[in-house]
Swiss-Prot record:
<dbReference type="InterPro" id="IPR037133">
    <property type="entry name" value="THP_succinylTrfase_N_sf"/>
</dbReference>
<dbReference type="Pfam" id="PF14805">
    <property type="entry name" value="THDPS_N_2"/>
</dbReference>
<dbReference type="GO" id="GO:0016779">
    <property type="term" value="F:nucleotidyltransferase activity"/>
</dbReference>
<dbReference type="InterPro" id="IPR005664">
    <property type="entry name" value="DapD_Trfase_Hexpep_rpt_fam"/>
</dbReference>
<keyword id="KW-0808">Transferase</keyword>
<protein>
    <recommendedName>
        <fullName>2,3,4,5-tetrahydropyridine-2,6-dicarboxylate N-succinyltransferase</fullName>
        <ecNumber>2.3.1.117</ecNumber>
    </recommendedName>
</protein>
<comment type="pathway">
    <text>Amino-acid biosynthesis; L-lysine biosynthesis via DAP pathway; LL-2,6-diaminopimelate from (S)-tetrahydrodipicolinate (succinylase route): step 1/3.</text>
</comment>
<feature type="binding site">
    <location>
        <position position="143"/>
    </location>
    <ligand>
        <name>substrate</name>
    </ligand>
</feature>
<keyword id="KW-0220">Diaminopimelate biosynthesis</keyword>
<keyword id="KW-0963">Cytoplasm</keyword>
<dbReference type="InterPro" id="IPR011004">
    <property type="entry name" value="Trimer_LpxA-like_sf"/>
</dbReference>
<keyword id="KW-0012">Acyltransferase</keyword>
<dbReference type="InterPro" id="IPR001451">
    <property type="entry name" value="Hexapep"/>
</dbReference>
<feature type="binding site">
    <location>
        <position position="106"/>
    </location>
    <ligand>
        <name>substrate</name>
    </ligand>
</feature>
<dbReference type="GO" id="GO:0005737">
    <property type="term" value="C:cytoplasm"/>
</dbReference>
<dbReference type="GO" id="GO:0009089">
    <property type="term" value="P:lysine biosynthetic process via diaminopimelate"/>
</dbReference>
<dbReference type="InterPro" id="IPR018357">
    <property type="entry name" value="Hexapep_transf_CS"/>
</dbReference>
Amino acid sequence: MTQALQALIDQAWEDRTSLSPKSAPNDIREAVANVISQLDSGALRVAEKQGKDWIVNQWIKKAVLLSFRLEDNAPMSAGGFAQFYDKVPTKFANWSADDFAKAGFRVVPPAVARRGSFIAKNAVLMPSYVNIGAYVDEGTMVDTWATVGSCAQIGKNVHLSGGVGIGGVLEPLQANPVIIEDNCFIGARSEVVEGVIVEENSVISMGVYLGQSTKIYDRETGEIHYGRVPAGSVVVAGNLPSKDGKYSLYCAVIVKKVDAQTRAKTSLNDLLRGD
C-alpha cells in the first residue's frame, strides 16, 4: 500500500505544473488526502531516525507541497475563534471533548495547528502555531508565540520557549526539515531554520540564530560545525573575528558539553552561566 502510494505521489510531483484544483485527477486527490490524514494521526512522518541517522521521506514532503495545488482557498473557522481564508483546515476545528481527551494534550487559546500536523500525548500548545506536516512528540512544550514550521520534527520533552521560530520547508522551499531531538531546550526568540538538526540533550540560549551557513564554534576544540548542533551542547550567541581582524561576524558558540545525567540535574541557568 505504502509503495503504491509513494509511486503515485512521486509521479504527481513530476506532473505538478499541470495540476490545479479543477484539473487534478481523483486518484491524486485521494492519495494526497491519504498522506495528510496519516500525517495528522502520526501514522506517517516526514523524517524518521534510523540508528544514528535521520532519513527524510521526501515523497511525504512532496505530498504536503502538492496539497496546496489541489485546493482552492475557502472560508474556515478555528473552533469559532475567527474566520479565515485558506487552503488547509485547522486541526481542531471539528474536534469534540472526546477527541481531545483521547489525544491527551493541552491546547491553550488561541493556539492554532493545521490539519496534517501531529501532536503527541502530554504535549502543551500555548498560544502558538504548528504548521502542516510538523511532528510534536510527547511531553513537549510549545510556548507562547512559538512557531513550528511545516514538516519540522520536534522530539520528546522539548521546550520551545516564547517566540521561538522553527523553520519549515514550504517557503522558501527547503530540502530537509528542521529537527529538534529529544530533551532539548530552545531559548526565547531563537530561530532554527534551513534543515538544521539540534541533537538530543542540547540547550540553546536566548536569541541564537541557526541556519545552514551559521558557524557553530566549539570553544573547547576549535571545531566549526555547520547545520548540526552536536548532542549535549550548550550554545550561546557569539562572534568570530575575520581573518584580517578588521571585523567580526555572528556565530553560535558551544560553550560546554553535558551528558544526559548532568542535563537532568543541573538548572538551565547554571548551564548557561557557568564558565
